[in-house]
Amino acid sequence: NYYAYDDGSAEAAYGLNANGAKLAYRFNINTTDTLRAIDIHFSQVMEDVTEEFFYLTVWSSLDPETIVYQQSFQTPYYEDSLNKFHTYLLDDQLILNGTFYIGWVQTSSEMLNVGFDKNNDASSQLYYNASGTWLNSIIDGAVMMRPLFGDTIFPYVGIDENQSFVIDQNDFILFPNPTSNKFYITTNNQYNQNTIGEINVEL
């Protein structure tokens, strides 16, 4: 359910070092489909940039520049295994057909360092904009960023959607608590897709 130019192995990393820089990766689909998420493999090759925000962005065109989706306050995430992708779920369903571009808009000049496959050349599909003009990448290779399509990106687990069940508070652990940015959940429960709501309390 994904499209890829890379082979899943990063030999290097690719990044832009300009505040407000944009990176766009061109894909083309022949039939109408629903974009659900974007997989990105960020490589920690230099400094930790997991607190650097970017706008996850989808374009339908770069000339003229037409943004059809943008999701703010995203940060690079380093997965705990070699060459593993992190899935950025879209907040809304996005129906696409034909040519589109996925990528990001930076909010700082820090290089985010996406994994770069040097064995497959997709430079003709990769564009960047650091000074107001979109340019084609001149570096041979493929960034490790993939669009995910379909009705759902989660496998069916055989649970009736009307079935209810109770998770005891001892079934999971949330840490760290408190936190101002990221948190993690570990659970022994067989149901691994959860909904997290927001509760604001003022004293």
Tell where the protein language model's regions lie, with residue ranges.
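A short beta-strand element within beta-rich, extracytoplasmic domains
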Residues: 33-46, 104
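Aromatic- and Gly/Pro-enriched, solvent-exposed loop/edge beta-strand patches characteristic
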Residues: 48-124
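Contiguous beta-strand segments within globular domains
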Residues: 22-24, 33-39, 180-184
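Short beta-strands within extracellular/lumenal beta-sheet-rich domains
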Residues: 16-29, 85-86
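C-terminal outer-membrane/trafficking sorting elements
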Residues: 54-60, 163-203
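Boundary/junction segments of secreted and surface-exposed precursor proteins
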Residues: 1-15, 156-162
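Short, surface-exposed beta-strand/loop patches at domain edges
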Residues: 105-156
